[in-house]
Amino acid sequence: MRPLLRGPAGNDDEESSDSTPLLPSARQIEAAPACCSARYNLALLAFCGFFVLYALRVNLSVALVDMVDSNSTLTDNRTSKECAEHSAPVKVHHNHTGKKYQWDAETQGWILGSFFYGYIVTQIPGGYMASRIGGKLLLGLGILGTAVFTLFTPLAADLGVVALIVLRALEGLGEGVTFPAMHAMWSSWAPPLERSKLLTISYAGAQLGTVISLPLSGIICYYMNWTYVFYLFGLVGIVWFILWMWIVSDTPETHKTISHYEKEYIVSSLKNQLSSQKVVPWVSILKSLPLWAIVVAHFSYNWTFYTLLTLLPTYMKEILRFNVQENGFLSALPYFGCWLCMIVCGQAADYLRVKWNFSTISVRRIFSLIGMVGPAVFLVAAGFIGCDYSLAVAFLTISTTLGGFASSGFSINHLDIAPSYAGILLGITNTFATIPGMIGPIIAKSLTPDNTIKEWQTVFCIAAAINVFGAIFFTLFAKGEVQNWALSDHHGHGN
């Protein structure tokens, strides 16, 4: 039996208003089949897009190892001696045809960090533009631009460090519009009782892109040379763009092949949630406490996420003393767990709402708590386990895996409170959530001058404390119903 779209119960308490969907009670429409549907085709193509997006983002971190002349790098060996050496000797690379550069550690840090300085700039403009011109073109151009710039990475490296830093910042500008644009598209495509499933499918591509691109980039460097990392991923991005522009539409109403029943199902399920206002209510948005609950949660979650994304390979190498080949696999393993968790949680969250009548806010709170407190606990445990390599890797993997719960929590709450402005809201929250990527690793490095286990325990404890604070703040102040300022006067008065 397919779920029916039920009407509101008629009372005004929070639990009732949170238990979407919002259709007039006089009309009940069965959910359109998922198989081969336009909305799930959109989710799968978006999945591929975010797969490519994250492959384009993280490939430099692997290629940089081959780009730098290790004999000339002006850095000391910071490998800790607290844990015993246990890795097998590293196999010598087959290929050394790629050009080498004499960049010290500080220069490499600027190259890797320059992406975020572009990424943070286009978050809010991206959300605003998506609400005006639609997310399809904006998301497509964002990934296309990043792919094209990626193709020019070898040329920029030859021109010098400044050129490469500028190029990476431009890639960040392109990627900055993508998540707000996707959120804006889902505001027109995702029925309330399918939001968790559809959004987690699409955004899970980012995790799998990280999992695949990290070891694949290493393989490409090993058997070919580092330039092909950028050429191959860049070309894949261009192919994806062509498919995206050919298949996808901004709304169900403009889709060429969608069935009449599916279009009616989607449009009807959203009709009392979308605003007809032309002017963005910026003051009301910025005064909204539920929005700031998402901001705090997003910032807190990303502090841990970016700390691990950028420093986990360092911890694996310098503290746990895994070799380069083991490091690539073990650093990708946690993100594979997170990818699986995101897919399962998307199904589970909507199942709780449909079958068990959980309210929207209850689901968002539960999944956010598990997805933020759980990682905090296991991150601290990983720090205090010392040199037990197996347990340390297991705890770090569990920590990142549990973070996948948050994908059905605060991560999609923008669509619950203001579907018409979801792209703008995500732009706002992701602007704040990008800051940890810029300062978190710097703070972590400053806290580990001697690279001891005790210093890393401090890094992990700070990240865990920030995560727990964000989870508590979101639980206290988040909402699950569409806010009054996000509705037109017509809908706001219930007519």
Curated annotation (Swiss-Prot):
Motif (Dileucine internalization motif): 22-23
Cellular component, GO, one term: plasma membrane
Catalytic activity field: N-acetylneuraminate(in) + H(+)(in) = N-acetylneuraminate(out) + H(+)(out); D-glucuronate(out) + H(+)(out) = D-glucuronate(in) + H(+)(in); 2 nitrate(out) + H(+)(out) = 2 nitrate(in) + H(+)(in); L-aspartate(out) = L-aspartate(in)
CDD domains per the UniProt record, alphabetical: MFS_SLC17A5
Protein's UniProt keywords contain Transport: yes
Record-annotated membrane-spanning stretches: 42-65, 110-130, 137-157, 163-186, 198-220, 226-247, 291-312, 332-354, 366-385, 391-412, 424-444, 456-478
Substitution effect: residue 39 to C: Markedly decreases H(+)-coupled sialic acid transporter activity
Membrane-side (Lumenal) residue stretches: 66-109, 158-162, 221-225, 313-331, 386-390, 445-455
Gene Ontology molecular function, alphabetical: D-glucuronate transmembrane transporter activity; sialic acid transmembrane transporter activity; symporter activity
Family stated for the protein in its record: Belongs to the major facilitator superfamily.
Designated name of the protein: Sialin
Protein species of origin: Rattus norvegicus (Rat)
